[in-house]
Amino acid sequence: MEVAEAGVDGVAGRRQQEEASGAAPFGRSSSLIGAAGFDGALRELKDLRSQLHQTADCCEKAFLDTEKKKLILESTKGYICDAIVAVIDHLGTVSSKLEQQLQEKIEITQTEKKLNFLKQRLLTCEQYAITLKLLTVRGDNDAIQYHRRYLSQSTGGTKEENGANSRKDDVKFVEYNSPTIPGAILTFKPYDIQSTIGRERSVATTDSESPTTDAKSSFSFRAEDVPIVLAEHRKKANHGSNILSFIRKGRRHA
């Protein structure tokens, strides 16, 4: 009878141990559980929490119903170790998935930064090209500096007039070849600088009796010397007329 009772107790203890061990939702190969993504890993972690609560309730019932509590405690310790390993495994999976997503976001941000850097370089190149074009336009002497409607049509005429005035200011000495006869009266026309530049004039005399008509002398002529020359010749003419009048008076008295 005692042997039969011992056998019944052994079978009951094995059944309770199997129930306690069967309550565990995972074994030591729980690290092989994979998740498709970060959301799947979080979902498995939540399911693991509910499974741990269910296993704790089963172990408590088995511990209260059986007389071999030491065996239930040992099986519960083993289950707790497996549960801790599974939880750590799930946490590692969640962290790896999270790190993977963060890495993808970092790669995206890095590519965006590279694109922005390339755009900035292109912009600097365009600005440099624009500055070079501006320098070439500034260096072009034939380029139009103002708008056409702000330019008058008399611009070219004013430039020519300014050039002519600058030429008039620079009066040159002109050489004249003319016969010089003492006592002759010289007459000059009003001078024109543009017509006299680079030309020679011969001064005609009214007295043709002198034998020195072929003698020629070159002298330089200036506009301001005209009244001086006229005054000298008038003095000589008056002196000659005075001599002639004196001779005539002497003949009359004789």
UniProtKB/Swiss-Prot annotation:
Organism of origin: Oryza sativa subsp. japonica (Rice)
Protein's recorded name: Probable protein ABIL5
Cellular component, GO annotation: cytoplasm; cytoskeleton
Subcellular location: Cytoplasm, Cytoskeleton
Subunit structure: Binds SCAR.
Residue span of region Disordered: 1-26
Protein family: Belongs to the ABI family.
Alphabetic keyword roster: Cytoplasm, Cytoskeleton
UniProt function note: Involved in regulation of actin and microtubule organization. Part of a WAVE complex that activates the Arp2/3 complex.
Main location: cytoplasm
Alphabetical list of InterPro entries matching this protein: ABI
